[in-house]
Amino acid sequence: MAIEGIIMNQYRVLKPLIALLLLVCAHASAQTQQASQISIGNGENNWITVEGVTRNQSTLTFSEVQIDGNGWLVIHPFEDGAPNGDKYVASTYLEDGKNLDVTIKVHKGLVSGEMFIVMLHRDVNENKVLDFVFVDEQNVMDTAVFEGSTMIGHAIAAP
């Protein structure tokens, strides 16, 4: 009887810990699944036309960029074969709506075939200054533009 009592006491102590562990594992799994569902591309209200991008030295021209609200067209570099969203090499201000023949100068220069990410950022505080200051581990003040789980952006090669 004494052994059964000890086992029951241990079970009562371990049961909530096991439940908590299962809950934490389920939450981590849901976060991983949610993060893996994020994609890049165009949306219904925000888009970047990447077909036919032209280049004049280090300046690129996009025929059409649509943004719902004022914001920025931003270019992030690839480094060691992967995009580096922690820095940017070009930005240009966009007004709400359709913007035609958008030019953006890449400060570091361009090499034909070089990969980069072109994406939209919202001018959150409407000051016409790209506030590329991290507010947490992943997001800058002028946040990336999303439609649902689609981040409005593209990985493209320099022409």
Q: Which sequence ranges carry the predicted segments?
A:
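Bacterial N-terminal signal peptides that target proteins for export
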Residues: 6-17
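Bacterial N-terminal signal peptides
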Residues: 17-25
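Short, surface-exposed binding/anchoring microloops in extracellular/periplasmic proteins
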Residues: 41-86
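Exposed aromatic-hydrophobic patches
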Residues: 61-62, 98-109
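Acidic, glycine-anchored loop motifs typical of Ca2+
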Residues: 83, 124-133, 139
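Solvent-exposed serine/threonine-rich low-complexity stretches and specific carbohydrate-binding patches
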Residues: 85-98
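Short, aromatic- and glycine-rich surface loops/edge beta-strands on solvent-exposed regions
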Residues: 114-124
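C-terminal partner/receptor-binding element of secreted or periplasmic proteins
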Residues: 132-159
